[in-house]
Each structure stands twice: as structure tokens, then as C-alpha cells.
């Protein structure tokens, strides 16, 4: 996005500052992250956020960011895409979806990924083989809420990542608190505004 940001700044005649860092620069800030955020926080974008914040602090004391706009104004591509995909899946009888999803999960993706590598780059799907198990699980989900939770989750069972780990209860586990909206896009935006936004985005910047 740097090229586009520079072009917009030039067009508007605004002051524009760029910062380019090396992998070593990024690695060097990692030991300080737990102290800065006072808690384990796994969003990798905290690293560039910290670097650009330190750059900004050399010139100003307060900055305004655009965080939160995507959740409030339907800015993420996953909202329209998830809406279309789930509406399509809902039309397929559940037994068929369960069968198809299970087949996808056991399908050997490596051969297809190898064949895709011969196609033009725009047709290639990065990490296709790794994505198949999750795709199969998405097809098998029985509700829009569970479909969305699985689509934005890195791990099916986060509690299994550490010994004795237990995933805390969240809004995703309390469907009775969901608002009564007819549009699945609004449901996704609500879930993000009540979970992802305060527990990730606004943990990183406020």
C-alpha cells in the first residue's frame, strides 16, 4: 500500500513519512512486546504498529487511526464473501454438506497444489493443501454463526495449544445474546464489533 499512500499524499499535498525496516529490526522489538501490552497478545501486526508508533512519537504525541471503520461500515471482504458463500451452503441439505465436507478434509491437496503451480500466478491458490481441512470444516458447519467463527479462527480447538488450556467463553458461545437481524452481513459485523474489535484491534491501538 506504500506506493498508493505516497501517491494520495502527493495529490493532496500532505506531509508524508515512510519507514522501511529490516527483518532484524522487527525481531528486535519482540522481547519488549509483553511489557508494552501487559498481556500475551498474538496479533503479529503489533510489531509494525509499534515500529510506526515509535516513528510517530518523534514528531507528535497523539495520532488518529482508521481502526474500527471496517467493522462498523462493512469494510472487510469477508462480509460480502461470507454472505454469498453461506447463503449458497444453506441451500444444500445438511447430510450432503457433511459428506462433501468430510471428503474435502481427507482429499490429498498436494497433487492439486503442484498442478496449480503450472498455471499463471493469478490462478494459483497459496497454501492450497493446508487450506483444504478448514474448507471441509466450513462446508460442514450448521449455522451462520459457527461458519463465521470457524472462518476467522486459526485453530479449531485453541485450548489444545497449551497443557491444561481452556478457551474462555465469548459471545460466540452465547447465541442467545445475538441481535435479531435478518442480514447475515450485519450478524458478522456485530460479532466482530463485540469480539475482534475490542479484544484485538482496540487492544493494539485505541
Predicted regions and their residues:
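ATP-dependent adenylate-handling active sites, centered on carboxylate activation for C-N bond formation
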Residues: 1-166, 184, 204
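Short alpha-helical scaffolding segments that buttress acidic/His motifs in well-ordered protein cores
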Residues: 30-34, 191-193, 197
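Structural motif
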Residues: 42, 179-192
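Short Ser/Thr-interspersed hydrophobic loop/turn segments at strand-loop and sheet-helix junctions
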Residues: 56, 193-206
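A short, charged helix-loop
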Residues: 165-176
Amino acid at each position: 500500500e506504500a506506493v498508493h499512500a505516497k501517491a494520495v499524499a502527493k495529490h493532496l499535498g500532505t506531509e508524508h513519512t515512510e519507514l522501511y525496516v529490516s527483518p532484524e529490526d522487527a525481531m528486535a522489538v519482540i522481547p519488549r512486546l509483553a511489557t508494552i501490552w501487559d498481556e500475551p497478545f498474538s496479533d503479529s501486526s503489533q510489531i509494525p504498529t509499534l515500529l510506526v508508533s515509535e516513528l510517530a512519537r518523534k514528531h507528535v504525541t497523539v495520532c488518529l487511526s482508521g481502526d474500527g471503520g471496517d467493522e462498523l461500515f462493512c469494510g472487510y471482504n469477508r462480509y460480502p464473501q461470507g454472505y454469498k458463500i453461506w447463503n449458497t451452503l444453506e441451500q444444500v441439505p445438511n447430510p450432503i454438506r457433511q459428506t462433501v465436507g468430510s471428503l474435502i478434509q481427507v482429499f490429498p491437496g498436494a497433487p492439486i497444489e503442484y498442478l496449480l503451480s503450472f498455471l499463471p500466478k493469478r490462478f494459483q491458490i497459496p497454501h492450497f493443501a493446508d487450506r483444504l481441512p478448514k474448507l471441509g470444516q466450513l462446508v460442514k458447519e450448521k449455522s451462520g454463526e459457527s461458519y463465521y467463527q470457524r472462518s476467522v479462527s486459526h485453530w479449531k480447538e485453541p485450548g489444545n495449544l497449551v497443557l491444561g488450556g481452556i478457551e474462555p467463553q465469548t459471545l460466540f458461545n452465547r447465541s442467545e445474546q445475538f441481535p435479531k437481524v435478518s442480514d447475515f452481513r450485519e450478524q458478522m459485523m456485530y460479532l466482530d464489533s463485540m469480539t475482534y474489535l475490542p479484544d484485538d484491534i482496540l487492544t493494539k491501538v485505541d
